[in-house]
A protein has these predicted regions:
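A short, N-terminal "cap"/entry segment at the start of jelly-roll beta-barrel domains
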Residues: 1-42, 48, 83, 87, ...
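Short acidic-glycine-tyrosine-enriched beta hairpin
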Residues: 75-96
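Glycine- and acidic-residue-biased ligand/ion/polar-headgroup-sensing regions
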Residues: 57-76
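Short beta-strand His + acidic residue motifs that chelate non-heme Fe in jelly-roll/DSBH
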Residues: 49-55, 71-72, 93, 98-105, ...
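Conserved hydrophobic/aromatic positions in well-ordered beta-strands
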Residues: 37-39, 62, 112
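Short, charged/polar surface micro-motifs in flexible loops or helix N-caps
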Residues: 34, 42-46, 66-70, 117
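Double-stranded beta-helix
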Residues: 100-138
């Protein structure tokens, strides 16, 4: 039994806190199979400085723990559909969809992201230039 307990202790993982302008992300898992984050967006804040981002590989599901999450999903013309998620709501976002987040209430929005592995080379930031009528990738 003591050996089994020692083996379980080895499986305990550390987390990393990533401070952002809009809140923070607590990464509690990111390995070759999956990623887990607890994300907090402060009231009145929007992710990525208001820009959108997307992933070509990463498949994400969001689960709201506290507050209201406003998930904006962009279309090719620069418009977007806003999905409002309340506590205990979840939403799957498949690869390729441009998106951003904001808090929709006076309290911080906390939500869990469960996804395939997070890779920095699979995060693309962009915004829509209305004059050029095209997406600009930054």
């Amino acid at each position: 039994m003591a050996q089994a307990q020692r083996e379980l202790t080895k499986m305990k993982s550390k987390h990393t806190i990533m401070e952002k302008l809009w809140g923070n992300e607590i990464w509690f898992a990111n390995n070759e199979m999956y990623c887990g984050k607890l994300i907090t967006i402060e009231p009145g804040e929007i992710s990525s400085k208001g820009n959108f981002h997307y992933h070509e590989i990463k498949d994400e599901t969001f689960f709201v723990v506290q507050g209201i999450l406003l998930l904006d999903i962009a279309d090719e013309t620069g418009g977007y559909e806003r999905v409002t998620l309340f506590e205990n709501d979840s939403y799957r976002l498949m690869p390729g969809f441009k998106h951003r987040f904001s808090a929709g209430s006076e309290v911080p929005c906390k939500f869990v992201e469960a996804s395939t592995t997070h890779r920095e080379d699979d995060s693309y930031r962009c915004y829509y230039d209305k004059e050029k009528e095209e997406w600009i990738y930054v």
